[in-house]
A protein has these predicted regions:
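Short metal-coordination and nucleic-acid-contact micro-motifs, chiefly zinc-binding Cys/His arrays
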Residues: 63-67, 81-84, 99
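A generic structural micro-feature
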Residues: 20, 80, 95-97
């Protein structure tokens, strides 16, 4: 479960940046094609945050859809599955977004 290591890194990054202030909320953006399971990150967050400035903070996750351009026909397509096909039947998609994993917002007091 790589989400544990990812969540540890998120907590560590936020804790370094807040300068000892208490964090009340963290908003993450996770692309549907990132390979990161949002529910697993939620499960790990409280464990990783324990004993840090993030202890007790609320975690909000915004899931981002994927988009790509078909290399065969040039059509833009929504891509929420790594095995998605274009309407023309081609699997040769240039994924433009949906692979993101970023900290969008941090609220501190």
């Amino acid at each position: 479960m790589h989400e544990l290591a990812i969540t540890e890194s998120i907590v560590s990054t936020v804790a370094e940046r807040v300068g000892g202030r208490r964090v009340t909320r963290v908003v993450l953006e996770i692309g549907r094609l990132s390979g990161v399971v949002p529910d697993a990150v939620r499960f790990c967050f409280d464990l990783c945050a324990e004993g840090t400035e993030l202890a007790g903070a609320r975690l909000d996750i915004v899931q981002l859809s994927g988009h790509g351009r078909c290399r065969a026909c040039g059509e833009l397509a929504d891509v929420d599955d790594p095995l998605a096909l274009c309407a023309c039947g081609s699997a040769d998609l240039d994924v433009r977004d949906g692979q993101e994993l970023r900290i969008r917002e941090v609220e501190v007091v």
